[in-house]
Curated annotation (Swiss-Prot):
Domain of life: Bacteria
Record bears the keyword ATP-binding: no
Keywords assigned by UniProt, alphabetized: Cytoplasm, Methyltransferase, S-adenosyl-L-methionine, Transferase, tRNA processing
Listed name of the protein: tRNA (guanine-N(1)-)-methyltransferase
Molecular function (Gene Ontology), one example: tRNA (guanine(37)-N1)-methyltransferase activity
UniProt enzyme class: transferase
Pfam families: tRNA_m1G_MT
Gene name for this UniProt entry: trmD
Higher taxonomy: Bacteria, Bacillati, Cyanobacteriota, Cyanophyceae, Gloeobacterales
Length: 227
């Protein structure tokens, strides 16, 4: 998969892309990540990418010309999605991450900034609009990193044990069951006996019940009414 990041702050991504899973995925050829700065496509010598909003109002709005030019300069690998990271977008869900990882060969991530982007970018350039939640960040760089991390770990060749992905939170619309490791007794807090029993059917049943209980308590919105 190719992932293109369109951002005014390329340096924001330098360290994260050189660490841990993302670094291994890039080095292993699982994904190719490129960064493009819209300032390189500005029409004036000041590299202007924003302007005041028509009709008045606070803040500055990202101009359409540099963003369109930046995206249009990229190679096209079909199928491709152009994703605008914005608080007005649909909340990011695991099911959408799975869809992106499975259905697309190229993702173009548009990182908004300042007061927002010209509406024509939303209407005629972006194919999707995604938000991390009901809060506002300085720009789209942090959401872009979250999206990249969530997608890349789903690509074949990134995570060694694919079975571990199937038991995580939000797979099957349930939160993950509690996890324990050694020691079995820490400060009097003991690992549940069933996990020490070696009885795989009982362990599977316990984990399923824990998933349901934890989801009911913390995220009942994930469950169907009859659950």
């Amino acid at each position: 998969m190719r992932i293109d990041i369109v951002t005014l702050f390329p340096e924001f991504f330098v360290s994260p892309l050189q660490c841990s899973l993302l670094a291994r995925a890039i080095a292993g050829g699982v994904c190719n990540i490129a960064i493009t700065n819209p300032r390189d496509f500005a029409a004036d010598r000041y590299r202007t990418v924003d302007d005041t909003p028509y009709g008045g109002g606070a803040g500055m709005v990202l101009k359409p010309e540099p963003l369109f030019a930046a995206v249009e300069s990229l190679p096209i690998i079909a199928p491709r999605a152009v994703i605008l990271l914005t608080p007005q977008g649909r909340p990011l869900k695991q099911v959408f991450l799975r869809s992106l990882a499975a259905d697309y060969a190229q993702l173009v991530l548009l990182c908004g900034h300042y007061e927002g982007v010209d509406e024509r970018v939303r209407a005629h350039l972006a194919t999707h609009e995604i938000s991390l939640g009901d809060f506002v960040l300085t720009g789209g760089e942090i959401p872009a990193l979250a999206l990249i991390d969530g997608i890349v770990r789903l690509l074949p060749g990134t995570v060694g044990n694919r079975a571990s992905l199937e038991s995580e939170s939000f797979e099957d619309n349930l939160l993950e069951y509690p996890q324990y490791t050694r020691p079995a007794d820490f400060r009097g807090w003991q690992v549940p006996e069933v996990l020490l029993s070696g009885h795989h059917a009982q362990i599977a049943h316990w984990r399923r019940e824990q998933q349901l209980t934890r989801t009911r308590e913390r995220r009942p919105d994930l469950l169907p009414p009859e659950a």
